[in-house]
């Protein structure tokens, strides 16, 4: 399937509102996608799903109420998710997963996701820029499990867990992000990560450390960050990790 435009619809469903499989060069724009939480198909459904799709543009949509992820991108590459509003979802606001490469998530607003605001996982890659993420139930932005993420200009506020995390052999950079009110660390690099650069971030009022590098992570650079109001240390590097400050 190619060249399909899904534009200005209002969809209320007990299951996934829009699902594309094996599609390319399509657009999903200016839709209102609401998952109703009272049907037999509600459990384990995403708001919007891309599976084996390339070059899909997802813009200016409102997504609410899904049991799992607001927008799920699986085994799909070259897709753009921009200027969407995602709120009150059961897992991640945006989930980029399973070898999905060269995707972009920009200028989205993600509020009250029960797990992570934006997650990039399982050998995927994404540019994550200029998003506003608030009240994530765990982590604001998570890059993990062999994935690469370039995070810049994001605002992450009041995450219950960490603000931004690189974990499990992840790599990439976090630059010029604003992280405030994290319930744990503002920015965490952990679990054998390498080649991570943290620069020019503004991190305030983290309950634990502003920046934490731990658990055998190496080749981590920490430069020109502004850190205030941390409950523990501004910057913490464990004895089994290596970082240049």
Across the structure, where does each feature detected by a protein language model lie?
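Parallel beta-helix/beta-solenoid
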Residues: 1, 6, 18, 22-24, ...
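Low-complexity/repetitive intrinsically disordered segments
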Residues: 1-9, 226, 231-245
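Low-complexity, intrinsically disordered/propeptide-like segments
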Residues: 10, 23, 36, 51-53, ...
